[in-house]
């Protein structure tokens, strides 16, 4: 994936929050990390997050992605994109 012209980020990179670290979320995280975006994944399963951390350069937050406290911990206000899968 590449950033299209007109993106609000001038450096071409985005902070992307992915809610859900399952198969689809992990695939998205991998692609966004390949493009050197700043990726944060929220998931309720610690083992799933640990697996992502061993293979990718990203931040993980364990918790419920629908919980405002979890979103705050993930610094959702700084996100350029939020993907819930």
Give the location of each predicted region.
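Cytosolic regulatory regions of ion transport systems
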Residues: 1-85
């Amino acid at each position: 994936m590449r950033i299209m012209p007109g993106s609000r980020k001038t450096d071409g990179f985005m902070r992307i929050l992915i809610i859900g670290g399952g198969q689809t979320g992990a695939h998205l995280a991998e692609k966004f990390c390949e493009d050197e975006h700043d990726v944060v994944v929220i998931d309720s399963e610690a083992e799933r997050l640990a697996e992502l951390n061993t293979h990718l350069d990203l931040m993980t937050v364990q918790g419920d992605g629908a919980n405002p406290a979890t979103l705050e911990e993930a610094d959702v206000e700084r996100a350029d994109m939020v993907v819930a899968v």
